[in-house]
Swiss-Prot record:
GO BP terms: cobalamin biosynthetic process
Membrane topology: Multi-pass membrane protein
Phylogenetic classification of the source organism: Bacteria, Bacillati, Bacillota, Bacilli, Bacillales
Enzyme class (EC, first level): transferase
Family, per entry: Belongs to the CobS family.
Primary location group: membrane
Catalyzed reaction equations: alpha-ribazole + adenosylcob(III)inamide-GDP = adenosylcob(III)alamin + GMP + H(+); alpha-ribazole 5'-phosphate + adenosylcob(III)inamide-GDP = adenosylcob(III)alamin 5'-phosphate + GMP + H(+)
Transmembrane segments: 30-50, 51-71, 105-125, 131-151, 167-189, 193-210, 226-246
GO cellular component terms listed in the entry, alphabetical order: plasma membrane
Protein name: Adenosylcobinamide-GDP ribazoletransferase
Length: 246
């Protein structure tokens, strides 16, 4: 449970006053990423449902996106922007990594954030009808399950000393397997074939994205993990929007 509290404390703005700091619990907190996604998803679902009662679907979607960024502290979005700045520079590997470490945000990072938020907002607005509330639970959970594979399958950048270093040692294969069993079972229960398709295609995307970035950089780091989460969430939403015919 302490590992779960570490994950909640670091990856959300939710206060955890009873947290007991522990390096071992921090390493094992990676196994609880999908559970953190569930907490985030339930909060977003509540905001979205309240927004739909009071406002139009688009206003509800915008409020949901604001809550999405706020509850995560913009941590994963920061990784998405840093990676966009680095890869968008079209520089050699070492310069890309230097750009990603720079605390300043460049034009490519800003554009990438705007495009991602527009995609998410548009998808949330399109999915604002009865019976589809579960998508706001599925997207954060699926994305944080997919990133476990990114952490496990590709090496961490050896020269990087960021917060993601060392967490792979605490990640167990059994946690990944159990997480996927739960995610797919819950997906089937919540939305049948449409949600299952969204989870599966976002998994394929996350693997492709991770492989492409790792090939370019020689590994992955915390920024890359954040980018995997953000982009996988968007893919889940887009597939759900386009899967009405299933």
């Amino acid at each position: 449970m302490n590992a779960f509290l570490h994950a909640i404390s670091f990856f959300t703005r939710i206060p955890v006053p009873w947290l007991r700091p522990s390096e071992e619990a921090w390493r094992k907190s990676v196994n609880w990423y999908p559970a953190v996604g569930l907490v985030i998803g339930l909060l977003l679902w509540g905001v979205h449902q309240a927004g739909l009662v009071l406002f139009s679907p688009w206003i509800a979607a915008i409020l949901t996106l604001i809550a999405w960024v706020y509850v995560t502290g913009g941590l994963h979005m920061d990784g998405w922007m840093d990676l966009a700045d680095g890869l968008g520079s079209s520089r050699p590997r070492e310069q890309i990594l230097a750009i990603m470490k720079d605390s300043r945000v460049g034009a490519m990072g800003v554009l990438a954030a705007i495009m991602l938020l527009l995609i998410k907002a548009g998808a949330v607005a399109e999915l604002a009808h009865p019976g589809w509330g579960s998508f706001l639970i599925v997207a954060p959970v699926a994305a944080r399950t997919h990133v476990l594979l990114s952490i496990k399958l590709w090496p961490y950048l050896s020269a990087d000393k960021g917060i993601g270093k060392g967490i792979s040692s605490g990640l167990s294969v059994s946690s990944i397997i159990v997480s996927y069993i739960i995610v797919f079972a819950a997906g089937w229960y919540l939305g049948g074939l449409q949600v299952m398709t969204a989870i599966f295609l976002s998994l394929l995307f996350a693997l492709w994205f991770s492989r492409s970035v790792a090939k370019k950089l020689g590994g992955l780091n915390g920024d890359c993990y954040g980018a995997v989460i953000e982009s996988s969430e968007a893919v889940v939403l887009l597939v759900l929007v386009g899967s009405w015919w299933l």
